[in-house]
Amino acid sequence: MFSMLYFPMVSVLSLLGADAPTHLHSHLKLILGGEFNAALERSSEWAETTVASERTSWDLQLHADLQLVLGFEVEAEENYRRAQRKIRGSNSKIRIATCRNAAWQALFRYRVTTALACFSRICDEPGIEAGGLMEARFGIACALYEMGRIDDAFDAIDSMEKIAEQQSDEMRAHWKDLIAVLRFDLVVQSELRRAAAFVDHVYWQSAQSMSRVDRAHGVSEAAVSVETPLLRGRVAYLLQLRCAAAGNRDAVAELARCLDAAGEQGFVDFRYTLRLEIALALLAGDAPNLAQFVLEPISDTLHGAESSRRYREYFYCAAKVHLAQDHTQESLALYRRYALIAMRCLREDALIGRQFLVGQELKQLPQSDDVTVRLPLKYRRAYHYILQNLNRSDLSVREIAAEIGVTERALQNAFKIYLGLSPRELIRSRRMERIRTELVDFTLTGERNVKEAARKWGVQNGSTLVIAYRKEYDETPSETLAR
């Protein structure tokens, strides 16, 4: 996915915006220059030569981010855990870190709805700093794009611009350059997938219809004026992609150089994304044989049983190549696989409410659960037990601990470490979410009152309800119902 290119830059910018150690500026310079491998090598050297007590959560997190984006997923997961254990301060910081780390891992594993749930929860944290909030909004934009919701992705990026104004002059300039290129990237991606040759690309054709004139106005001019080498290189690539889609064969050599550069950086997964983008452009430009050549390294690694979101675009491109070459049966077989994956994705994505919009006071949160992916397997059972018994007013921590065979203290510690919440706080939060959903869903009909919703979810005392609800949403249940 194209977000892999921007992620390291967003990561280090968000850290620098949080008064992180000054030596992270050297990492920023390497990352802005597109030298991810060199940044990882420097980070690895630091990890090997620094005693454990001197390693900060920021250092470990950035190290894990670089590992994740360059394909070292197992090592990244371990370093995320180490970073989380280093966090000192409020429970909010722990919740933000665990949500954030789980979100990026989920996104790069193409578990898009889980990533969106995690990122959206970060945005609801009252203690989130400007850099972390912009990173979460960027993550939301990436997840929404992968779901084909380009209009909503644009809205998420637009919301970043307002937050960028809170940054220092240097950081604000970097964020604004990033936002300018992100907008241009989305415009080009949308143009490419909605080209006349791709009317049968059902996943994208069934998605929201972006107003190209409104969205594209002034976008390319802002993007071509950026000075950051990493972003400038991406803009040059996108311009060549447009040329290839228009049938200009001279663009192919430059696109091939971009592929080679990604390989030299060890950017394996991003190189996969580039191949798909280039193949789409070549197909749009009526060059199916060149598209086949670009796709061959992917074809050689497939085993025949791939069915995840990751392969959706590949099967579509391969089907179009075979159709152009009059291999009708092969094309039909590949298109069936594409259509099956596309339908699975659409069904999964349908779990996300249509009302999900960034920055609105009352928004319907994604139903995909972020807590499960943040907890170790044993303690996921405890969480699932909580969800199954939320309606019981007598649900206790002792009962939950006994259900999974651990002590109350062990359960408390695990929830604090991985969620930044105690079991009681999680129960209260989930109950308030359910009550709020009841009130919002029935606002138009008036068939549900506050007391009924509270009793349904195990809250018997009116004062307890008002205090807990106000703590979660900064308003009373009656105020929600009155909207």
Where do the model's predicted regions map?
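Structural register within alpha-helical repeat arrays
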Residues: S26-H27, H63, A102, I140, ...
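Sequence-specific DNA-binding recognition helix
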Residues: F442-T480
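Amphipathic alpha-helical segments of tetratricopeptide repeats
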Residues: S44-E48, R81-R88, F119-G127, D158-D169, ...
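Residue register of alpha-helical TPR repeats
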Residues: P21, W58, A97, E135-R137, ...
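Structural motif corresponding to the intra-repeat A-B loop/turn of tetratricopeptide repeats
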Residues: G33, L70, R109, M147, ...
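Basic, amphipathic alpha-helical hairpins
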Residues: Y383-L395, F415, L419, T437-E447, ...
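Terminal helix-turn-helix DNA-binding modules in bacterial transcription factors
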Residues: L421-R455, R483
